[in-house]
Amino acid sequence: MDPEQNAWTRRHMLGMDGLARHEIGAILDSAQAFRDVNYREIKKVPTLRGKTVINLFYENSTRTRTSFELAGKRMSADVINISASSSSAAKGETLLDTVATLQAMRPDVVVLRHGDSGAPHFLARHLDAGIINAGDGQHEHPTQSLLDLLTIQDHLEEMGKSSFEGMNVAICGDVLHSRVARSNAFALRTLGANVRFVGPPTLMPSEATKVFGVTVHHNMEEGLRGVDVIIMLRLQLERMTSAYLPSVREYFAYWGLTRGRLELTQPHALVMHPGPINRGVEIASDVADNPNRSVILEQVANGLAVRMAVLYHLCTGAARNSAQLGESL
């Protein structure tokens, strides 16, 4: 790829909506270079020495927060973790007041997870630092989408494909409350994949076809037939304010990914899940642990490399291609 075309020029990583193919490619190329670092005996590089990264989490998240913390530290950045429960936010401080406090610290990047959609965009308008959206309400979760893309890309050859073009991907479950579903729909469509939302009508956004350009299936068997990739989503009961389904047991009976339903997909189909997994609710244990089909643990491992890549581009404004980055590591 032409280095000029592979340049990353954005100040923030707020979402997958609007990112071009070459921008997604720049992150994935860099992530592949950083992945090698994580397999060295000494898993540390001086890439972000002297840079300050603040992880500001208003919602709990073991995987995402730990992944961002480790990503920053492995690149020698100074990393500060702030959780809402232990910060002034718990005492009534507004997000705008928090912005003023952060501005005084002069960080290079702020990683924000927040329960309100649009909160990272608010920070980007008021804070002189790069902002990474680590999940905002039901809006987007771009780094989860990027690690999903990297995981799929790793398996293109065994799937008999050279790119995402024409790939069939089913995103199944609680799509309504899922920021992961939204980010993946935007990204996969940009890369040329065909995306299906599969789930009960009560858990499907009304704007699915118009906004995301996907096809919608309310029958699990129909939605899974012939797909190359399955991305299962958990039921986000904490975001449900009314009865969206009769019972968890009935949900699994109709919408759970079982071995029998997996057989409806392509023989090479990948099983993915952003976590945390609810076994026996959206996915059966023998499917989640299937060594030939499940790549769930690969997703976790790739998350670290992707977040290193995003921090690298935002902190350095780097427009290097992957070969140049690899030489510098």
Swiss-Prot record:
Q: Which InterPro entries does the annotation name?
A: Asp/Orn_carbamoyltranf_P-bd (IPR006132), Asp/Orn_carbamoylTrfase (IPR006130), Asp/Orn_carbamoylTrfase_sf (IPR036901), Asp_carbamoyltransf (IPR002082), Asp_carbamoyltransf_Asp/Orn-bd (IPR006131)
Q: Name one GO molecular function term.
A: aspartate carbamoyltransferase activity
Please name the top-level EC class of this enzyme. transferase
Q: Which keywords belong to this entry? A: Pyrimidine biosynthesis, Transferase
Q: Which GO terms describe its biological process?
A: 'de novo' pyrimidine nucleobase biosynthetic process; 'de novo' UMP biosynthetic process; amino acid metabolic process
Q: Which residues bind carbamoyl phosphate?
A: 63-64, 113, 141, 144, 275-276
Task: Give me the residues that bind L-aspartate, please.
Answer: 91, 179, 234
Enzyme Commission number, as recorded? 2.1.3.2
Q: Which reaction does it catalyse?
A: carbamoyl phosphate + L-aspartate = N-carbamoyl-L-aspartate + phosphate + H(+)
The pathway is:
Pyrimidine metabolism; UMP biosynthesis via de novo pathway; (S)-dihydroorotate from bicarbonate: step 2/3
Q: Which one Pfam family would you cite for this protein? A: OTCace_N
Q: Name one GO cellular component term.
A: cytosol
Record has Transferase as a keyword? yes
Family note: Belongs to the aspartate/ornithine carbamoyltransferase superfamily. ATCase family.
**What assembly does the database describe for this protein?**
Heterododecamer (2C3:3R2) of six catalytic PyrB chains organized as two trimers (C3), and six regulatory PyrI chains organized as three dimers (R2).
Give the function comment from the record: Catalyzes the condensation of carbamoyl phosphate and aspartate to form carbamoyl aspartate and inorganic phosphate, the committed step in the de novo pyrimidine nucleotide biosynthesis pathway.
Q: What is this protein called?
A: Aspartate carbamoyltransferase catalytic subunit
Species for this entry: Magnetococcus marinus (strain ATCC BAA-1437 / JCM 17883 / MC-1)
- Gene name per UniProt: pyrB
